[in-house]
Amino acid sequence: MIISASTDYRAAAQRRLPPFLFHYIDGGAYAEHTLKRNVSDLSDIALRQRVLRNMSDLSLETELFGETLAMPVALAPVGLTGMYARRGEVQAARAADSRGIPFTLSTVSVCPIEEVAPAIQRPMWFQLYVLRDRGFMRNALERAQAAGVTTLVFTVDMPVPGARYRDAHSGMSGPNASLRRIGQAITHPHWAWDVGLFGRPHDLGNISTYRGNPTGLEDYIGWLGSNFDPSISWKDLEWIREFWKGPMVIKGILDPDDARDAVKFGADGIVVSNHGGRQLDGVLSTARALPAIADAVQGDLKILADSGIRTGLDVVRMLALGADTVLLGRAFVYALAAQGEAGVANLLDLIAKEMRVAMTLTGARRIADIGRDSLVNLP
């Protein structure tokens, strides 16, 4: 299959992956309306073309939390990334490192912190949930600090797991799920050989290290359901703010009032996000929510955004709507599943190329030049 655009990787991933894994990353909550709108609302935003602007010294570089990024992009935390390629978190982290951007390790990664951090040169970020087991949370924070993690991404939009009906149909969950997954693996020999056989152990590395026993795919959904904490409030985050000395980013903000609360709390940044449409169907797309949030808190903290970003044009659109940096989730997992580390590196090259074209034709020589006046009409 020829890969010529950043969006080509989705089809390549679907061909390679067993259905339970493809639909787990590809799907969303309920009827998936928000999932679809994340993409469509962003693609509907019109950029303002400018010409004869002397764009010969264009640069994608930006600064974030004291780090220099080659472009305003980071890889988002994605659970079970290590099931999409052999030791997938390590491969994705290496690709991000080679392209000068941060990689964010998920709490529910296959590869543990101690395996991923030594594989790269630049410090990685780490994502954490609020869980009933506060001992695990403290243990994870201590291990992250010991591994040299600089930035903590704290996900707050998952006090309960979303209703992801596609998972039950695909075999990730539901009746006879284990047998269905085995059958799917048999019919996808490339994945079965690369990941199923040589990508072991298939457990949740960060959790298994803490518990002292394997926590595999069979335990994943049950562990999530029993450990997410619906009683969470801003007060529950205070000890984490005191404990964590580096930048702390609150992920899962969709409302300006919550963004203002994050400022009061002392967060260094927020991620405007609806969890990729995987939590509550029917909420605003990130593209629709971002402008009002930027108006409310821009300048008080750093604004990151995810959900619906598939191309370099999408990155530029999000920056114009008010983001300082974006997170790529599904897009990099598709590339990882299709071509491993090389696929993620190539995806980032394609996105950088698409950004350069968009910036050249909108008259933005620097990332700071991208703003509301880069758009024809706001949504």
Curated annotation (Swiss-Prot):
Membrane topology: Peripheral membrane protein
Annotated GO biological process: aerobic respiration; lactate metabolic process
Predominant location: membrane
GO molecular function: FMN binding; L-lactate dehydrogenase activity
Location in or out of the cell: Cell inner membrane
Residue ranges constituting the FMN hydroxy acid dehydrogenase domain according to the UniProt record: 1-379
PROSITE patterns according to UniProt: FMN_HYDROXY_ACID_DH_1, FMN_HYDROXY_ACID_DH_2
EC number: 1.1.-.-
Cellular component GO terms held in the UniProt record: plasma membrane
Keywords: Cell inner membrane, Cell membrane, Flavoprotein, FMN, Membrane, Oxidoreductase
UniProt: FMN binding residues: 106, 127, 155, 251, 306-330
SUPFAM superfamilies recorded: FMN-linked oxidoreductases
Annotated catalysed reactions: (S)-lactate + A = pyruvate + AH2
Residues forming the catalytic site: H275 (proton acceptor)
Enzyme class: oxidoreductase
Cofactor field: FMN
Pfam families: FMN_dh
Protein's UniProt keywords contain Acetylation: no
Classification via InterPro entries: Aldolase_TIM (IPR013785), Alpha-hydoxy_acid_DH_FMN (IPR012133), FMN-dep_DH (IPR000262), FMN_HAD (IPR037396), FMN_hydac_DH_AS (IPR008259), LldD (IPR020920)
Family: Belongs to the FMN-dependent alpha-hydroxy acid dehydrogenase family.
HAMAP family per the UniProt record, alphabetical: L_lact_dehydr (MF_01559)
Role summary: Catalyzes the conversion of L-lactate to pyruvate. Is coupled to the respiratory chain.
Protein name in UniProt: L-lactate dehydrogenase
